[in-house]
Amino acid sequence: MSLLLAGLTVLMIGDSHMSTPGYLITTLHDDLKKDGAHVYSYGACGTPSGAWMEAIRPPCGSAFRLDDGPLRVRPSEAGFTKPLPELVKLHHPDLIVVINGDTMGGYKDPAISKSWVRDEVKRLTDGIKASGAACVWVGPAWGSEGGKYGKTFAKAKAMSEYLEQIVSPCTYIDSLKMSKPGEWPTIPGDGQHFTDAGYVSWGSGIEHAIVTSDILQKIKH
């Protein structure tokens, strides 16, 4: 239980790391619930951050979990996600947690498309500003090299460092500080998505970063 999180409403939105049972929509959601928060989680696989400002059909499915309710997974053809303004009106969050980095990393490309990433991030952070909620932005974890998405430790580091520069007013959570490169096991041949044990460790690390950050001190209870 966290005295600072207890009773707060947390809205979590993210990419593929929030779209499958056993991923962060399971582990981090559970950790924040144990801290006494009301948690509403939504994942949209394969979508950049700016896509949360409109209703979209995620290319590889979506998922949602409403506080104590069950985790619901939807294939891409099942319909559209709810945009952030609608989610804010529905849940009235005190804190918005954004988990989006790998999807925009373009790890197979020679370099990060910085202007595109900046535009995507700004589109979402502008929406978060308008909501009046506090915000944290969770950057990518190390993963492993040699997977099908082209992720390498150097590219994960470059993406994390760039996101940290551009996600204001959100407080940046650097996932790379939570483990050593390759420490958390990924799905064989994947390199980007973790095994259950990896998501347990990542969820715990994010939860610790949230409850020990200054941002909770600024939220009125």
What do the predicted segments below correspond to?
Residues 97-106, 124-157:
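Active-site segments of SGNH/GDSL-like serine hydrolases
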Residues 112-122, 153-159:
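Charged helix-capping and loop-helix junction motifs
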Residues 141-221:
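Catalytic His-Asp segment of secreted/periplasmic serine-dependent ester chemistry enzymes
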Residues 1-9:
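Hydrophobic alpha-helical targeting segments used for export or membrane insertion
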Residues 84-88, 121-125, 160:
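Generic structural signal for well-ordered alpha-helices
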